[in-house]
A protein has these predicted regions:
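Conserved phosphate/anionic-ligand binding catalytic regions in large, soluble enzymes, centered on
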Residues: 34-50, 174, 178-207, 260, ...
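Extended, charge-enriched "interface" segments that sit outside catalytic cores
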Residues: 2-171, 188
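Hard-cation-handling environments
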Residues: 428-533
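Glycine/aspartate-rich loop-and-adjacent alpha/beta segment that forms the canonical ThDP
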Residues: 3-6, 12, 31-41, 45-98, ...
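Cofactor-binding active-site loop characterized by glycine-rich and histidine/acidic residues
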Residues: 189-350, 354, 545-601
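Thiamine diphosphate
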Residues: 314-433, 636, 648-659, 706-886
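ASCE RecA-like P-loop NTPase motor cores
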Residues: 527, 541, 560-744, 748-750, ...
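Active-site cores of enzymes that catalyze phosphoryl transfer or operate on phosphate-rich substrates
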Residues: 128-150, 216-268, 272-276, 694-761
Length: 886
């Protein structure tokens, strides 16, 4: 592992107690403790703040006297890595240069001894290296000038435009350029970049090769492109192909909203998808963060922990903190005395931090080289904390002197990095001339770039393979593979009974297919056709309701403890890729990851399943900003499938509601599909159709829970899997005389079966029960055709289990009015509006359900076995709403 780098002595334990009697301790040990003190604590006094406003604590361990050593004391033998030091004083100077300069190492969160040794070795070996060549330094100066010039041009032309200036951290541009060059050195061919809006426009032009004229036009309120763009320019992504001395690197800057840090899991999901398809060695995720957001946003901590799990690891991410030491108007200063930094959340995941002064570009480049080497060797996260300042306010509409007058006075007197770096180069051409040249390059040099960036380009459509024809023989073959037990393995009795039932089912064309079997057969048939399937979420291997059983845990004990068999991964040699990943207990990071995965793997069926649909609101940012709006804003097409177990069963407001109404409120422009299948065959066809759709769209499924999974009436015949496709509307096949029907009750989901039981028990042939299986895009034509078959129809009722302020009613009302035949009246029967939602009493829930069904089918009658008191008042909370009055 270390063949490319020199070996260094293993650091000894860190000494915290002052040495009072050095004569009793061997001198090599004292020197080792002195060196170790700098390795572990030197960053606390390092010269990493350009403004030098951060408090510098007294760290006595960094003084030779603390260890009983005198500065003029000779070193008896040369020290590996410090051969030029002849005395303790010279050693101290050397250690200060290495660990207390403009680049400092913080490995306080790294518990792995091997990684710490490597980091110490790299710091000690590179500190003596000569600065970059004059040519390299001139190139860096050019990059800094380009960054500075961009900010000045935008400020002059569009003084009122928000650009989220990079001024104070312009070194980010040479940093990102160096990352790309170093990535090429390591054989990276795909670099996935995520970053917030601070400095993004600058990076689009100066890193992503975007046309300056194009970006300026997006800022011009009078331009045609500004009038037609679907998102703000500092949210847009781009893709470019960069040439490096070691080969070409394709760099993709991911689109993202203003919701800070949300793009982080998206980028690592995209990276993992690329790695799964092409090999993990060729792809690098790089995420740029703001200091306040990195410390403050929970999605950061969730994702840092998520990627430590094998199913979500992108083999290490390079993090870059643009640390301007302030968040909006709130100071976010380093506190070395209290050991408080914006990167502290990364200590929990063993990530080292390279802290570097943004006014020292040469050290910035050294930090990049060390960080990339570390990531490639250890396949682990590492952070570069680029410490600068914010010359202007949060945005150009801000007046920072209102809240930070003293800080702004210091910043106003501080020279820019271009001036400082130009001065360090000595005999370089006059700066005024260089700035004029940089302006010409900016205005004229990007438009004709041969590898110009593609902005807001649509993600490539999936090259889907048509679904192969299904036959009973094929399903039997797949069932044999699904139920095959590896030789010598003992499986759980429950699994044995289940697989026996599946074999019996497929042996009979009229056999009833349970939901678990239908889902597994859907995946198996897709995999057999060469499609890939990825399914992740909490407990997805077994399923929250013991409804999937895609992972079998061996019951043998002994050396088989923990061993599993995944039947869907062992169907045949030529099958598609199947991944099933039990996620940690997080929604936000996982949903963001899977969305990113779906973008980079459009040919795969990528699925996230919530433990209960209610918990999807823990990931609301990704629903609102990415899934619902990503295609319209950025052209990002995704076939991500979101399964939300949904339905009122008397288990309370936290385990009943997939927020159907909220999803429907987000529906527009055919941005996604929302479905609520009521049979196992529908479930089977829905999943297969989603995988094969030529134009990918996200699919939101109000999926079954315990009652529907166990309802035998929802289990379709085996022949239903062989025929047809997903039906957006299901007709009432029990109606024998359509002219007798006076009322049609429409519903979606399991409430249909409660309505059917009550209707059939009453023997009422004047009521037809029609299921709307897809709620968006709403099947107007299909439903109009069904309703048109009932020539004497008087009333259409929409019945839903959900409260009137939730569920589908307020969305479907306009759709139903558009297809209502003649003089029919439209009403809705729902639970009454409620702030919390479902009832937590099973008895009260059942009484509510009976009253709801009775109201939907006829006159509002008291439920059988009704009770007085609080329950009765809740039972009365069923609303029958006339559409015109709603």
């Amino acid at each position: 592992m270390f063949s490319r780098y020199p070996e260094y002595a293993t650091p000894v334990g860190f000494a915290r107690a002052e040495v009072r009697d050095a004569s009793r301790i061997a001198k090599p040990l004292l020197i080792g403790r002195f060196i170790d003190a700098h390795r572990h604590a030197g960053f606390r006094v390092a010269d990493i703040d350009p403004l030098r406003l951060a408090a510098c604590p007294d760290v006595p361990e960094l003084d030779p006297g603390f260890h009983g050593l005198a500065p003029d004391e000779p070193l008896d033998t040369p020290l590996v890595g410090f051969e030029t030091a002849r005395t303790v004083g010279e050693l101290a100077q050397r250690l200060e240069l290495i660990y207390c300069g403009a680049l400092a190492l913080d490995c306080s969160g790294v518990r792995d001894e091997t990684r710490r040794r490597w980091l110490f070795g790299r710091m000690e070996s590179t500190a003596s290296n000569p600065v970059p060549s004059l040519g390299q330094r001139h190139a860096v100066l050019g990059q800094l000038l380009a960054a500075e010039t961009w900010e000045r041009v935008v400020a002059e032309r569009f003084a009122d435009a928000k650009r989220f200036s990079l001024e104070g951290c312009e070194s980010l541009i040479p940093l990102l350029t160096a990352v790309i060059d170093n990535a090429g050195r390591h054989g990276i061919v795909r670099l996935l970049l995520g970053m917030p809006h601070r400095g993004r426009l600058n990076a689009l032009v100066n890193v992503m090769d975007a046309s300056a004229a194009d970006v300026l036009a997006r800022l011009d309120p009078d331009s045609d492109i500004a009038a037609t763009q679907t998102d703000l320019p500092y949210h847009l992504g781009a893709t470019t192909r960069k040439r490096t001395p070691h080969g070409a690197v394709t760099v993709q800057l991911a689109h993202n909203p203003s919701h800070l840090q949300s793009v982080y899991p998206v980028v690592v999901g995209m990276a993992r998808a690329w790695q799964d398809a092409h090999g993990e060695a060729g792809c690098l995720p790089v995420v740029v963060h703001g200091d306040a957001a990195f410390a403050g946003q929970g999605v950061v901590t969730e994702t840092l922990n998520l990627v430590r799990h094998a199913g979500y690891s992108p083999s290490g991410t390079l993090h870059v903190i643009v640390n301007n030491q302030i968040g909006f108007t709130t100071p976010n200063r380093m506190d070395a005395a209290a050991h408080v930094y914006c990167t502290d959340v990364a200590r929990g995941v063993d990530a080292p931090v390279l802290r570097v002064n943004a006014d020292r570009p040469d050290e910035v480049l050294r930090a990049v080289a060390i960080a990339l080497d570390y990531r490639m060797i250890f396949r682990a996260d590492i952070l570069i904390d680029l410490i600068g300042y914010r010359r202007l306010g949060h945005s150009e509409h801000d007046l920072p002197t209102l809240t930070q007058p003293a800080l702004q006075a210091v910043i106003g007197a501080h020279p820019g990095v271009v001036d400082l770096y130009h001065a360090s180069l000595g005999g370089t051409a006059p700066l005024d001339g260089l700035r004029r040249a940089a302006l010409q390059v900016l205005l004229h040099g990007h438009a004709g770039a041969p590898d110009s960036a593609r902005h807001s380009s649509r993600e490539a459509d999936a090259t889907t393979t048509p679904l192969a024809e299904l036959s009973l023989e094929r399903l039997r073959r797949l069932t044999d593979a699904l139920t095959c037990v590896p030789p010598g393995v003992r499986i759980h009795e429950f699994i044995a009974r289940m697989t026996a039932r599946w074999r019996d089912t497929v042996a009979d064309e009229a056999g009833r297919v349970d939901w678990s079997f239908a889902e597994n057969l859907a995946y198996a048939s897709l995999l057999d056709d060469g499609f890939g399937v990825r399914l992740s979420g909490m407990d997805v291997g077994r399923g929250t309701f013991m409804h999937r059983h895609a992972v079998w845990h061996f019951q043998d004990g002994g050396d088989r403890v923990g061993a599993v068999h995944v039947p869907l991964g062992a169907l045949s040699a030529g099958q598609g890729r199947f991944d099933i990943v039990n996620s940690p207990l997080t929604e936000e990071a996982v949903l963001g990851f899977e969305y990113g995965y779906s973008l980079a793997a459009p040919e795969m069926l990528t699925i996230w399943e919530a433990q209960f649909g209610d918990f999807v609101n823990g990931a609301q940012v990704f629903v609102d900003q990415y899934i619902a709006a990503g295609e319209h804003k950025w052209g990002c097409r995704s076939r991500l499938t979101v399964l939300l177990p949904h339905g009122h069963e008397g288990v309370g407001p936290e385990h009943s509601n997939g927020y159907l109404g909220r999803f429907l409120q987000l529906c527009a422009d055919e941005n996604m599909r929302v479905a609520c299948p009521s049979t196992s065959a529908q479930w089977f066809h829905l999943l297969r159709g989603q995988a094969a759709a030529r134009q990918p769209k996200p699919l939101i499924v109000m999926s079954p829970k315990t009652q529907l999974y166990g309802d035998a009436r929802s289990q379709s015949a085996m022949t239903s899997l062989l025929e047809g496709a997903f039906a957006t509307v299901i007709q009432d096949d029990s109606v024998t005389d359509a002219m007798r029907v006076r009322k049609v009750v429409l519903s979606s989901g399991k409430v249909h079966y409660a309505l059917r039981d009550a209707r059939d028990a009453a023997g009422d042939t004047s009521i037809a029960l029609v299921r709307v299986e897809q709620l968006y895009p709403f099947p107007r034509l299909e439903l109009a055709c069904v309703l048109g078959t009932f020539g004497n129809l008087e009333e259409v009722v929409w019945a839903q289990e959900e409260d009137v302020n939730q569920g589908a009613w307020r969305f479907v009302r306009d759709e139903l009015e558009a297809v209502l035949p003649g003089a029919c009246r439209l009403t809705a029967v729902c639970r009454a509006a409620s702030a919390s939602g479902a009832h937590s009493s099973v008895r009260a829930h059942q009484a509510e359900q009976r009253r709801l069904v009775a109201s939907a089918l006829g006159e509002l009658a008291p439920p059988a076995g009704g009770h007085a008191g609080a329950e009765a008042s809740r039972v009365g909370a069923v609303e029958r709403v006339e559409a015109a009055a709603a």
